């Protein structure tokens, strides 16, 4: 969403403006209404582009993520996922908690044991237990096995690559394919 709305400003990890955030919220809501499970974002050094650059969402502002989470409001059973290095555990968890409180979305994050923060997982689980005692559905997920592939629309592997309606776009030039993917009928056929 960030790159789609902000272009190079997102790639350079510039702060999103209020207009950027509003545009991302519209697209996120459209995606959820079209069948997306929810919203996932990454603020970890581990996630990088193919050329080694940090992902555009690294260090995205807390207010940006909380605001985007509002797009899940009224969307029953949807998920807000945060992948983080947990530099500030209270701030990171506040994103999940606030989105869940305001929208009813399920919150999830990757729960890892980190050598440089050996007790972090216990703090995270304590925050989860506290949130669950307040009636929120927030869970840590243990990463059982790292995925070793790059997935995305311009890649050879993405969630739609085996759908005939998506395969029909394979031979189109990239810009043409993007235009077709914006078409509501094409989106509907793929989904």
Briefly describe each language-model feature range:
Residues 1-82:
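Catalytic pocket of metal/acid-base enzymes, prominently hydrolases
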Residues 9-19, 24-27, 31-32, 54, ...:
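Polyanionic/metal-chelating signatures
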Residues 42-45, 85-88, 144:
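Short, solvent-exposed turn/loop segments enriched in Gly/Ser/Thr/Pro and often Arg
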């Amino acid at each position: 969403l960030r790159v789609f709305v902000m272009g190079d400003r997102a790639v350079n990890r510039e702060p999103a403006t209020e207009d950027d955030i509003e545009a991302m919220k519209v697209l996120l809501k459209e995606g959820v209404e079209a069948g997306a499970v929810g919203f996932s974002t990454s603020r970890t050094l581990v996630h990088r582009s193919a050329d080694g650059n940090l992902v555009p969402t690294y260090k995205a502002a807390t207010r940006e993520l909380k605001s985007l989470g509002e797009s899940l409001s009224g969307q029953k059973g949807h998920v807000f996922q945060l992948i983080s290095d947990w530099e500030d555990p209270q701030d990171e968890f506040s994103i999940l908690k606030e989105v869940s409180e305001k929208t009813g979305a399920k919150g999830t994050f990757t729960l890892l044991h980190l050598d440089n923060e050996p007790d972090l997982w216990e703090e995270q689980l304590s925050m989860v237990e506290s949130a669950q005692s307040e009636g929120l559905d927030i869970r840590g997920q243990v990463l059982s096995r790292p995925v070793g592939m790059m997935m995305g629309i311009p890649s050879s592997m993405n969630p739609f690559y085996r759908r005939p309606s998506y395969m029909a776009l394979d031979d189109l030039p990239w810009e043409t394919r993007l235009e077709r993917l914006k078409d509501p009928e094409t989106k509907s056929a793929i989904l």
